A protein has these predicted regions:
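N-terminal ligand-binding/catalytic initiation module
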Residues: 1-62, 69-71, 78-81
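Short helix-loop-beta connector
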Residues: 77-84, 106, 168-169
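Glycine-rich Rossmann-fold phosphate-binding loop(s) that bind the pyrophosphate
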Residues: 90-91
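N-terminal Rossmann-fold NAD(P) dinucleotide-binding loop
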Residues: 94-95
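NAD(P)-binding Rossmann-fold cofactor-contacting core
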Residues: 103-130
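Short acidic low-complexity segments
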Residues: 131-148, 164-165
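Rossmann-fold NAD(P) dinucleotide-binding segment
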Residues: 147-150, 157-172, 188
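Rossmann-fold NAD(P)-binding glycine/threonine-rich loop
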Residues: 167-169, 176-221
């Protein structure tokens, strides 16, 4: 069904509660008129394990958290003068990543590409009414990279979309999509060729993220 479900838990020592999240991503759902992401969060008492609350957010909090993580990366790692962004993907994360980026960078133009040109055009049409910047659909991922100072990839792709030969001086890439072992948006050679590779968790990305594919290809240790 081209989908996945993930269960994650979090606890900070000393807090009176801990949380468990169940999140799903079923990437053919838009064809059925349904959102691709869904889920809920459960809050429990740290001392007793008793249920305190159920947050039926349907994946919204996960989407917001992911978008904010991308914006934080761009804020601290991209050129502060960047005014153009390229987005690979045309789903909910594409929208939320763009909205979050606008909080930290003075973006004037966004270039959008996805494998489904119809979906790309629909995305561009819908978001133009909500965001007061230029939104332009691109014909290829290479064109998107060439026009961009910041590039955000947010797809469930299992094969590389962005090639290493497209890299250019000053380009910042926020790669959001590869959150499972089989997912891969970037040519593994990019990890070797870039000036800096900064993962949120190296131990995690060496197994599940883009770093995993570069290690398997023998490009990095």
């Amino acid at each position: 069904y081209h989908g996945e479900s993930d269960v994650k838990a979090a606890y900070i020592d000393g807090l009176d509660s801990y949380a468990i999240k169940v999140a799903s991503g079923f990437f053919n759902n838009p064809n059925l008129g349904l959102p691709s992401s869904n889920g809920l969060m459960i809050l429990l008492d740290s001392k007793t394990g008793m249920l305190k609350s159920v947050l039926l957010d349907k994946g919204y909090l996960t989407d917001v958290r992911t978008a904010i993580a991308g914006a934080i990366a761009a804020k601290h790692l991209s050129n502060p003068e960047s005014s153009n962004v390229g987005i690979i993907g045309a789903g909910i994360q594409a929208k939320m990543q763009l909205e979050a980026l606008l909080l930290v960078r003075n973006i004037k133009t966004a270039y959008i590409w996805s494998r489904d040109s119809k979906k790309t055009n629909t995305f561009v049409k819908n978001i133009k009414d909500k965001i007061n910047i230029k939104i332009i659909a691109c014909e290829s991922p290479e064109q998107t990279v060439n026009l961009s100072e910041i590039l955000i990839t947010c797809t469930p792709s299992k094969s590389p979309i962005i090639k290493s030969e497209w890299l250019k001086k000053g380009l910042h890439i926020t790669a959001m999509g590869s959150d499972a072992e089989m997912k891969n948006e970037l040519d593994p050679k990019i990890i070797k060729d870039c000036d800096y590779y900064i993962p949120d968790s190296q131990s995690q990305t060496s197994i599940l993220g883009e770093l995993n594919h570069a290690i398997k290809a023998g490009l990095v240790l």
